[in-house]
Every structure is written in structure tokens, then in C-alpha cells.
Amino acid sequence: MMNVYACGGAGVNIAKKIKNGLANIYYIDTSTSNLKDISDRSKVYRVSGMDGAGKDFKVTYENFKDKGYEVLSEFTPSDQLNILLSSTCGGSGGMLSAILATELIRQKKPFVIIGVESFTSSKEMQNTLNLLKTYKGISAKNKANVCVLLENNEDTEKDVRSNRDKADKAALTGVNVFALLTDRTRTEEFDNADLNNFINFDRVTDNEPSATTLVVCNNEKTPQNSNTHIAAMLHITSSRDRDIVGEPPDYLCTCIVTDPEMNDLDYRIDNVIGGIDDRIRYYEKRIAQHNEKKNFKTMKGVDVSDANEDGFVF
């Protein structure tokens, strides 16, 4: 069975909705506010010396940077798959997931990251940008793949709560997809070696280790992006007669779903080199646009030089 490490407020709240029996779920946070209603306290790890991070990555890093081994000694990683679930924009979850990712790499355990993005403030966008760069840094330093499934809570609606719910549901769907892939009672022609090679495609292709994006999509031809390359593809289908559509990847594995309640499945997960870089460029552009507008709107300040030494004006 796979593990889910729910990191930070968003990760914890999404993980509470995971169906019983799909995964071993562990909760890691810097605050008790989201952990109070978890009945099994043996599955909870609270970072000492903190009461939330206030969207400050550095605070979480300083308090947790040496705790990855401790957490994974208490919550033993799965040999099948480990999911790190968090937002990308808060001060706790993203940094917790990055530090745990580093330890999972050290222990040679398979993992993917599921991250929920947010665009509700420039601080959140900057946090996400820094986290994506961190994933690239971790990959480069450890010469290992860091595969990230990003769920985007931005659309044209004005209801921010609705958008967040959609992104949370999409992240939950991602968890369910990987739970299916690790459930041998509902699948055939797919094993741990296939999943490992999909994640660590550098072992079976001529590609170098990289920080990549995972894209869950219907099995259909997708527009080509000159900045990205599909290094590995995982075809999930209920029919042995279906082939992949579009350009072939460097590595392909297929999972046949035998669950009778899933009798018309035909989709895939693309493991995309260059996807993280594309997303980094996107955030850099958005932040630059925000700062440009902010600077344009900044007006000349009001003179209060007549205030007394305590700042009061009479």
C-alpha cells in the first residue's frame, strides 16, 4: 500500500477526505489548528517550536531542515509509492514536502509530489516560484528525479472558495489515481518496477534526472510544446486493445484496470521534462506584471514632517 504524507494545512485538509483503506496517511504540520480532529494521534507529527509559519518558508526550513529522517523513521516509507501532498504557496506544507522529498531520495524510496497552487496574492505566487526552484535545486544536487503533479486553483470565476475546492478535488483525484496504480486487486500487467521506471525514467532512457511535471490527461493527441518533452508515459486503460494516441514517449508502461466499476477508462499520465521550467517562467512573468502594476499605482506620499517626536500631528 502507498503512503500519503499530508504536509501543512492544505495537505492535511485534503488528506482527511481520502477514502479509508486507499493509503497509509500521515499528517505533518507546524500548527495544531488543522490537526485537532485527527483521532489517531500516532499518525500525527507537529513541528516543535512553531505555531504556523505565516507563509514564511524560511521559518519552516530552519525548524524542520534536520527532521526529515526523524519523521520517516516514525512513519516508515512505502516501497511501492509515497505521495507528498501540500499546497505550493503556504509557509509550511511546501517546505515540509521538499525536505521530506530530500530524505526519500536519500533512502531511495519512490515518491511523487502533489501540489495545489494559488494566485490569491503575490506572496503566494512568490512562494510557489521559490518552491518550484527548490525542486529543481533538490533534483540537481541529488541527481534524482522530482516529479510534481500541480493542481491549479485559478479560473475565470470570482468565487475564490469555489476555485480552491476544485483544486482540492483535483488533488484528491490525483491521490485516487495513484492508489489505483498501487492496488494489485484492481489492475493487471503493471507492477512496482513499471511505476519505478515511470518515475525514475533516467534509469531506462538516455534522459538526465530532472524536476518534472506530471500531467493527467485523456488518451488523446495533445498540442506540442517546443519547451517540453514527454520522457515517460503511463497509460491507464480498461481495454487491452487501446494504444496511446500521439507522439510516442521515451518510456511507456501500461496499467490494465480490471475493476468492473471502471470499464471505460482510457487516460494517461505524462512525465514531462521542462514542465517545471515552463511553470517557473510563468510565475516570473505574473509576478513581474504584478510589481509593474503596483509601481504604477504608487502615488507620492503625504508629507507628515510636522509630526512631533511621537508621530502625532496637532
Region locations from a protein language model:
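Tubulin/FtsZ superfamily GTPase core signature
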Residues: 1-314
